[in-house]
């Protein structure tokens, strides 16, 4: 394992997918939660119930996704994830029902299980000596998204909550 931080051109797609995953996580954690509370008046108890439902459901769902990724490959799994997220984000932008929004929230969280495909993609394309340093770079890229997306999209939220989700779908 290389102990130096190395940014390699051949891993550009992995880095891009990592940034998108970090941005998407922030949209889910911050702005989907805002939507549930601000637009639909969800209480702390209701949001907590959704968190618990998501956690319980993913205990069952994540192993299925892992087997699916093994069967169809990372590319197909990630295409499915991102197409699904486009649908979820566009739906967040236009939803008028709190119950449908809650369903979208659970569906949105289900797609987190597909994030493992990004890691297995790196394992397939990466040099074993680069794994630690590439993971360090990816961790940093993910955190860059975690810092900038809430700030930028928070400003956008002040203009239009729907615009946040349309921008997330475009990303």
Please name every model-derived segment.
Residues 44-45, 128-138:
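Loop-to-transmembrane helix entry/capping segments in MFS-fold secondary transporters
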Residues 1, 34, 148-164:
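Transmembrane alpha-helix termini and helix-breaking/packing motifs in multi-pass membrane transporters
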Residues 30-47:
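Short amphipathic helix-loop junctions that connect adjacent transmembrane helices
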Residues 61-74, 157-158:
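Helix-to-loop junctions at the C-terminal end of transmembrane segments
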Residues 113-126:
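Intracellular juxtamembrane helix-capping segments at the cytosolic ends
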Residues 99-113:
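Hydrophobic core of transmembrane alpha-helices in multi-pass small-molecule transporters
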Residues 76-91, 169-170:
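Structural signature of the two symmetry-related core transmembrane helices
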Residues 1-23:
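Juxtamembrane intracellular "pre-TM" segments in multi-pass secondary transporters
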